[in-house]
């Protein structure tokens, strides 16, 4: 685990974005941890979040031309990541996002920001079922662009309805790499460093045994 990944886990814990306990997910699964990126909701949170996304992006080495943030959650993430890349990595890259409702006046269409062209890096909070990615792919392909990769905050590394995870399905279906700031494996490594969190570690490991990929 890299220093920025450990810092991200501590940041998420401090904001209660990441919580350990017993939670029922939308799928009905009982999970020993919960991650709600919507709680990164202040200016300082967003500034820090962008730096973590930018760090993971640079660390991945994937080449791309534009950041795309799917509406709605992806919009502030794409924006703050673009700012962080410019301020901390000297990479001044265009960004774009879609609006769910097409406008009938002013600037046309349902895209805001730079023209959607070239190799696209899609940024979002998490991938649960991959629906937002599929909708985004239609927009990307309709504009003649290609998907270079997908960047999210957390990869839960767990099976969906079948034998593979929603993330593995996206990688298979679109022949792209999905990268994340942290994974379930990183969470476990972090818990292993914290003796006071031993009960959570046991629960998360048991969960991985049952649902992990």
Swiss-Prot record:
Annotated coiled-coil segments of the chain: none
SUPFAM superfamilies: PRTase-like
E.C. designation(s): 2.4.2.10
Key word Transferase present: yes
Functional note: Catalyzes the transfer of a ribosyl phosphate group from 5-phosphoribose 1-diphosphate to orotate, leading to the formation of orotidine monophosphate (OMP).
Quaternary context: Homodimer.
UniProt-recorded name of the protein: Orotate phosphoribosyltransferase
Species annotation: Escherichia coli O45:K1 (strain S88 / ExPEC)
Gene that specifies this protein: pyrE
